[in-house]
């Protein structure tokens, strides 16, 4: 089963879209390291937790800063996707590809889909996906990156938002001075923070933190290539699938 799952992923991951799903019922709350989250069951039986925060909103004093840990009181209602990260205006001829979504700086959220049979500590394989868009556009909330179809095949599917454009990649001498000698890789740090969230919490959703594969599309594949070589990502994933990245 697992061999079939991993072997078919590269050919099929970009086709894993699903129609709008009717919500059948809410899910019992799950306690994560940051706080309690409540998801929902889709019409297919797939369990979904949408718009789960993995870092504090990167606004005001946290703009152009590494992502910071977040915690909350009460129950976070993870029943809808959150706004995409701020990005450049897309050409009209590709709007049909990405779709129209709300945008905002408060965008460091991830989405989790799990099979209907998943329970805490089921130890199912986990796929973490990073979206493409050249580092200037893209969204974890895009319908073409929806994880419902993959969850129906037996895997936990997670996609992670990260900052884009000038908010994700700007290096500046003053920022470098403030941040101890480096600046300009906030998007990469977001990608790492989301992956660490998966490592720390995915078992509670039915995933196996010792069986995590990372993958992505276009710029997302570039993120995967970076994480393969990143010392800070050591131990956070066990497999990587590089599907496509443009050279230069």
Language model features by range: what are they?
Residues 234-246:
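A conserved short beta-strand
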Residues 132-133, 186-190, 218-221:
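Active-site loop->helix "elbow" adjoining a glycine-rich segment at hydrolase catalytic centers
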């Amino acid at each position: 089963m697992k061999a079939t799952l991993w072997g078919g992923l590269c050919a099929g991951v970009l086709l894993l879209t699903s129609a709008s799903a009717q919500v059948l019922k809410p899910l019992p709350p799950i306690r994560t390291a940051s706080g309690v989250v409540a998801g929902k069951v889709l019409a297919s039986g797939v369990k979904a937790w949408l718009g789960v925060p993995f870092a504090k909103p990167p606004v005001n004093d946290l703009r152009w800063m590494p992502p910071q840990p977040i915690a909350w009181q009460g129950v976070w209602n993870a029943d809808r996707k959150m706004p995409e990260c701020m990005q450049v205006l897309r050409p009209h001829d590709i709007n049909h590809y990405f779709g129209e979504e709300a945008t905002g700086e408060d965008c460091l959220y991830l989405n989790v889909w799990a099979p209907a049979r998943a329970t805490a500590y089921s130890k199912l394989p986990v796929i973490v996906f990073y979206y493409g868009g050249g580092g200037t556009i893209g969204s974890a909330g895009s319908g073409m990156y929806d994880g419902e179809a993959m969850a129906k095949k037996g895997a936990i599917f997670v996609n992670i938002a990260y900052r884009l454009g000038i908010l994700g990649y700007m290096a500046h001498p003053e920022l470098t001075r403030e941040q101890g000698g480096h600046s300009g890789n906030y998007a990469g740090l977001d990608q790492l923070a989301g992956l660490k969230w998966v490592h720390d919490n995915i078992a509670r959703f039915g995933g196996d933190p010792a069986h995590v594969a990372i993958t992505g599309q276009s710029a997302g594949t570039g993120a995967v290539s970076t994480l393969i070589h990143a010392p800070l990502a050591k131990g956070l994933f066990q497999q990587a699938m590089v599907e496509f990245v443009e050279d230069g």
